[in-house]
Amino acid sequence: FTKGMQQMITSGCILMLAWTIGGVCRDLLSTPVFVKTFIETTGLPGALLPALVFILAAFLSFATGTSWGTFGILIPIIIPVAQSICPELLLSSLAATLAGSVFGDHCSPISDTTILSSAGAGVNHLTHVSTQMIYALTVAGCSLIGYLIIGITNGNLLLSLGTSIFILCIFTFIMHRRSKTILNKKDICSTQ
């Protein structure tokens, strides 16, 4: 019980500090206003917002090793930005924040979950990171395409999700055929 409480206290402190940083960015630094003005002055189309948020969340959580900290930093910034630029994309921008944060945390070599997973499995930490990266990058690429489509279609969830799943299935099929071909060549070479 006490070990579990110790882990919860650490997580709670990280979450509280992330909310504090998010509040400082929102209230004192006016980050949402800055981001909104930046997007408007650079001429970036609002349709790119979910995809850009996904990429930003992925990089931030990869660098920090925490998805919850990234939630606390980005969500208070993304909500007002999405509401002012393109309100139809608010939910997809929030989804992109969550998905990008979890992706970056999953791939980060400094993430507590990655460290505990490799230790629990009894494998080399960097080997674990590199083997997880292949699968995570595949899904992240399909997700990024989905976020681009949902932004371009102004929130068409069915088209976005369907396209992402279709691309993932095609990629999986191609990789499966490729691996069978490689394995068959190895079998032929070993019998000669």
Which residues are covered by each model-predicted region?
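Short helix-coil transition sites and intra-membrane helix breaks within transmembrane domains
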Residues: 9-10, 23-30, 60-72, 102-111
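Short amphipathic alpha-helical coupling elements at transmembrane boundaries
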Residues: 2-7, 33-41, 115-119, 126-130
